[in-house]
């Protein structure tokens, strides 16, 4: 399965829930597939899951989604133990695993040599940690993630990617600063966070 196929299924089940993407072209693909205003795009390596763990704990009535790559997840592994400790039932983490750092020349990541993110998540105390190697399994995981209490940790094994095969994606029409402002304004408009001037 491809990254785009995974994101298309994700978009069908996400609804209007807040979501965050990791760095690089994954966010740009999601923007093209199905842009929603409550999306924080292109967060730095290692930070997406940590940031939305905090959001999940602050907004327990909102299901929140993280989409990041294997490289970004590997850069922020310590967050898994914190998820296992606090177990926010509304947090869904999706790791799109292509086993490489594509934008740096497809340098293999640790998952290419056997590092098992699902086993790490389970070892950290995340019971609902699953691997999806095909679209039907990934879709079943998505269905469960919106119907059951989490936290969920889903690793989607996708086809090998490189810059030649995926092509150069279009640049985002805004930078990370504007993405943050838009994201916060959306949460504010929904009454989920106080107006910025009252903080």
Predicted regions and their residues:
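Generic beta-sheet signal
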Residues: 17-19, 62-66, 91, 148-156
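Active-site diphosphate/adenylate-binding microenvironment
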Residues: 1-44
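Short active-site-adjacent structural elements
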Residues: 28-30, 103-104, 140-141, 161-167
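Glycine/aspartate-rich loop-and-adjacent alpha/beta segment that forms the canonical ThDP
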Residues: 3-4, 35, 148-199
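Conserved thiamine diphosphate
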Residues: 108-144
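Thiamine diphosphate
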Residues: 28-98
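Long, charge-dense
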Residues: 96-107
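Glycine-rich beta-alpha junction loops
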Residues: 23-26, 98-100, 157-163
């Amino acid at each position: 399965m491809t990254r785009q196929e995974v994101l298309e299924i994700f978009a069908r089940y996400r609804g209007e829930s807040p979501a965050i993407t990791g760095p690089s072209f994954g966010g740009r693909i999601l923007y093209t597939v199905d842009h929603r205003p409550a999306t924080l795009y292109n967060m730095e390596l290692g930070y997406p899951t940590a940031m939305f763990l905090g959001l999940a704990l602050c907004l327990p009535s909102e299901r929140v989604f993280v989409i990041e790559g294997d490289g970004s997840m590997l850069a922020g592994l310590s967050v898994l133990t914190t998820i296992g400790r606090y177990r926010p039932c509304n947090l869904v983490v999706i790791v799109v695993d292509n086993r490489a750092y594509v934008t740096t020349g497809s340098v293999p990541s640790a998952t290419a040599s056997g590092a098992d993110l699902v086993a790490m998540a389970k070892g950290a105390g995340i019971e609902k940690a699953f691997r999806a190697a095909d679209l039907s399994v990934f879709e079943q995981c998505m269905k469960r993630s919106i119907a059951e209490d989490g936290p969920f940790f889903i690793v989607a094994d996708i086809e090998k990617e490189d810059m030649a095969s995926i092509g150069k994606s279009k640049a985002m029409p805004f930078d990370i600063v504007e993405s943050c402002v838009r994201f916060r304004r959306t949460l504010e408009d929904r009454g989920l966070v106080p107006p910025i001037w009252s903080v």
